[in-house]
């Protein structure tokens, strides 16, 4: 089966909610194509969809899917294709999802650099979505107390990502627009 056929088969399984089936398809693809980041990324995406839809705890209170493996597969895909904005954004998103805020912020800075390095790669959508997720995660972690040290440290980062996600080249550029006389 070609890579496109495998991806189509896995996508169809995901659409039907058969995340475990998609993960199995990606496992087979990874075994035969260990140097292709698409397999690792696809497996991690399917696993994350499963957790988001079904939760990750079984009847005994144990993780059904190893979150560390999900993060590792996202990291591997991003590392194998360091200029791929989608892979890097997905890795950052998973880090936010798994409450790894400092690591997520570092990954988002890499995403900013990917956007700066190429006029053909638009990372604004990824940054805006990540900023929203980051603020949500910080609020949950701090019980909506933005005076805590972690909130004070990372809310400004999230706001910066949001501003860049709106298409401004910098916070300073956005401030110039805010200070313009109407």
Give the ranges of each region predicted by the language model.
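Alpha-helical segment of the N-proximal tetratricopeptide repeat
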Residues: 2-32, 53-56
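"A position-specific structural signal for the A-helix of alpha-solenoid helical repeats
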Residues: 8, 42, 90, 126-129, ...
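Residue-level recognition of tetratricopeptide repeat
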Residues: 11, 45, 52, 93, ...
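Canonical positions in the second alpha-helix
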Residues: 29, 76-77, 111, 158
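Short coil turns that delineate tetratricopeptide repeat
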Residues: 34, 82, 116, 163-167
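TPR alpha-solenoid repeat register
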Residues: 39, 87, 120-123
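Short coil/turn connectors between adjacent alpha-helices in alpha-solenoid helical repeat scaffolds
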Residues: 48-67, 96-104, 136-151
